[in-house]
């Protein structure tokens, strides 16, 4: 039995609320159970120096946690003077994932910066961030369309992410913190709406896992991502 009493293939309650920040071109408040992330997408008329003059745009991401997003206060990284390796890894993952969803040439020489701020953490902050970031990005692109800033379609695919793991010998979907901290194996899957794989991160915490177990986790992830994509489509409709 899972601590949350969910079925092995059951997501936590998920909500995706678009347009929650009035100043941002795109925004989304995403909730995976008790994990809550505020995502904004900002359109900027600038590019990394190495991209200038190439006729295409860029998507980049930043990620951070509020000090009391966790049980005990975590010092702000700004006050520490540097980002942790975990933060850098996650924001690069978010940026990579979103770039697969976009026709960068159709975007033109512009940059969209996606900021993911974790308000409350209960496992799966990176997967919630990616899923909500796609909604914020779509919201930003819709904003651009209403101002005739785009000549062709920019969004190529939905992108969502979910965690899976082996908990008490059973493959389960969408781990919360209680499960993640005790799981024998945990993995994060980033996929497109049609089931193509963007990135997989998997680690055996206690016991190595078999190919069959990995395939079971991937099957759960496909099911979870399909449901998340349905919710994304409803959020941006």
UniProtKB/Swiss-Prot annotation:
Catalytic activity: tRNA(n+1) + phosphate = tRNA(n) + a ribonucleoside 5'-diphosphate
Family designation: Belongs to the RNase PH family.
InterPro entries: ExoRNase_PH_dom1 (IPR001247), ExoRNase_PH_dom2 (IPR015847), ExoRNase_PH_dom2_sf (IPR036345), PNPase/RNase_PH_dom_sf (IPR027408), Ribosomal_Su5_D2-typ_SF (IPR020568), RNase_PH (IPR050080), RNase_PH_bac-type (IPR002381), RNase_PH_CS (IPR018336)
EC number: 2.7.7.56
A matching Pfam family: RNase_PH
Organism annotation: Bradyrhizobium sp. (strain BTAi1 / ATCC BAA-1182)
Taxonomic lineage of the native organism: Bacteria, Pseudomonadati, Pseudomonadota, Alphaproteobacteria, Hyphomicrobiales
Subunit architecture: Homohexameric ring arranged as a trimer of dimers.
Molecular function per GO: 3'-5'-RNA exonuclease activity; tRNA binding; tRNA nucleotidyltransferase activity
Primary role: Phosphorolytic 3'-5' exoribonuclease that plays an important role in tRNA 3'-end maturation. Removes nucleotide residues following the 3'-CCA terminus of tRNAs; can also add nucleotides to the ends of RNA molecules by using nucleoside diphosphates as substrates, but this may not be physiologically important. Probably plays a role in initiation of 16S rRNA degradation (leading to ribosome degradation) during starvation.
Enzyme class: transferase
Protein name per Swiss-Prot or TrEMBL: Ribonuclease PH
């Amino acid at each position: 039995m899972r601590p949350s009493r969910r079925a092995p293939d059951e997501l936590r309650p998920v909500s995706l609320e678009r347009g929650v920040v009035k100043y941002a071109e795109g925004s989304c408040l995403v909730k995976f159970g008790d994990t809550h992330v505020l995502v904004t997408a900002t359109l900027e008329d600038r590019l990394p120096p190495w991209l200038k003059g190439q006729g295409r745009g860029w998507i980049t991401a930043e990620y951070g946690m509020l000090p009391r997003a966790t049980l005990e206060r975590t010092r702000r990284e700004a006050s520490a003077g540097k980002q942790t390796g975990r933060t850098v890894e996650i924001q690069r993952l978010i940026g990579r994932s979103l770039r697969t969803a976009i026709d960068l040439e159709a975007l033109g020489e512009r940059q969209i910066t996606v900021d993911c701020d974790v308000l409350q953490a209960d496992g799966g902050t990176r997967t919630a961030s990616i899923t909500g970031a796609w909604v914020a990005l779509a919201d930003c692109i819709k904003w651009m369309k209403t101002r005739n800033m785009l000549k062709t379609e920019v969004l190529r695919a939905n992108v969502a992410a979910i965690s899976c793991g082996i908990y008490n010998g059973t493959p389960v979907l969408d781990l919360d913190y209680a499960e993640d901290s005790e799981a024998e194996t945990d993995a994060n899957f980033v996929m497109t709406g049609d089931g193509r794989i963007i990135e997989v991160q998997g680690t055996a915490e206690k016991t190595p896992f078999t190919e069959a177990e990995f395939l079971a986790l991937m099957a759960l992830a496909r099911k979870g991502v399909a449901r998340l994509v349905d919710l994304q489509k409803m959020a941006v409709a």
